[in-house]
Amino acid sequence: MSNRKYFGTDGIRGRVGDAPITPDFVLKLGWAAGKVLARHGSRKVIIGKDTRISGYMLESALEAGLAAAGLSALFTGPMPTPAVAYLTRTFRAEAGIVISASHNPFYDNGIKFFSIEGTKLPDEVEEAIEAELEKEISCVDSAELGKASRIVDAAGRYIEFCKGTFPNELSLNGLKIVVDCANGATYHIAPNVLRELGARVVTIGSEPDGLNINEKCGATDVRLLQERVVAEKADLGIAFDGDGDRVIMVDHEGNKVDGDQILYIIAREGLRQGQLRGGAVGTLMSNMGLEVALKQLGIPFARAKVGDRYVLEKMQEKGWRIGAENSGHVILLDKTTTGDGIVAALQVLTAIARNHMSLHDLCSGMKLFPQILVNVRFTPGSGDPLEHDTVKAVTEEVEQALGKRGRVLLRKSGTEPLIRVMVEGENEAQVTEFAHRIADAVKAV
């Protein structure tokens, strides 16, 4: 990726009220995007958001900017990110825009774009938008200004799409499922999808108030879900993040089932049904246990850089159809164009219903290696801690100690000023000690 001023790995993101997530910048962003997108002929853009209170302000700013450039906005209201990608395709809109900071706290927000195909915008389009941002804002003639309207049946359209990815001959009758919607964008979607397919549904994290998105709930914190699954004697639990593009599951014993295990289940089921094309894509963070388990099944495995856009790029490069991050981004190109938590969960539920097996049993063919992740905050602009000699030396020592039976990965977060230190190996105590040793070295520089 080229060096850009505003667009990161997942659009533009930051704290609301601080540059660039301010009303004036977002208005200009809408205008700049409108100027670039108008060159392609279409005059309509889908705008969706999660449940953050700042979404109202930011969608109004985007609408004003787009209208000034001559594009009309179609609002979905609170809607999962993958739903916006789907609606962008079905409405033949020139682009889709999602106002969300995904799994971040409510005081953050962000803007990301989808192309007419429902995929992330190509780099060159993002670069063209950045170039327009450097210009003075202008307005088209009054007769050419854009309009705004709402898609009144957006939720219903997406619910039917999700249900369509679950086999007609199967149902979820007899399954009791606890669903944690992270007080986010899936709150009015996921429970209805599961109920309409026959499940008994218990909901948590489904009362958004604009401030409680991702707060001690959802895919980034499944402790409450684990407790409720056990207390309710449910068959399983499903947790989404604030914008619905991630999913983490919990088995009937309260054990967490992450994106690596979900990818394993979906890949194995695809192999059993003769529907798996090629192999599966993970990331540098994917557990070694996934690689070992897939190898035992004869399924090729490739690692991409961390970030769903890189998983997708690797899938396209290989011509493969399934990929995932252990954080719960699961991309299934036979079903949709981007990471979709609900669709991914439905494919796991397909394996449960078809094989009459529990989620716990479906995971049993894959043994996770102990993997310790430590996040270390650093001050932006203070130099790169990863390039410091002390950090390099400690990392090398750990790598030599682990040999071929473990891995070390240090990387910067694409969305926050964090260094992520990951150490993986067969001995949990050793791996934990190594991870904190490296993290301490990073903190000290």
From Swiss-Prot:
Keywords: Isomerase, Magnesium, Metal-binding, Phosphoprotein. One of its GO terms (molecular function) is phosphoglucosamine mutase activity. Gene3D superfamilies: Alpha-D-Glucose-1,6-Bisphosphate, subunit A, domain 3, Alpha-D-phosphohexomutase, C-terminal domain. Its cofactor is Mg(2+). The active site is at residue 102. The modification Phosphoserine is found at residue 102. Binds 1 Mg(2+) ion per subunit. Its EC number is 5.4.2.10. Transmembrane segments: none annotated. It catalyses: alpha-D-glucosamine 1-phosphate = D-glucosamine 6-phosphate. Activated by phosphorylation. GO terms for biological process: carbohydrate metabolic process; peptidoglycan biosynthetic process; UDP-N-acetylglucosamine biosynthetic process. It is an enzyme of class 5 (isomerase). PROSITE patterns: PGM_PMM. Pfam families: PGM_PMM_I, PGM_PMM_II, PGM_PMM_III, PGM_PMM_IV. Mg(2+) binds at residues 102, 241, 243, 245. GO terms for cellular component: cytosol. Belongs to the phosphohexose mutase family. Catalyzes the conversion of glucosamine-6-phosphate to glucosamine-1-phosphate. HAMAP family: GlmM_B. This is Phosphoglucosamine mutase. It comes from Cronobacter sakazakii (strain ATCC BAA-894) (Enterobacter sakazakii). The gene is glmM.
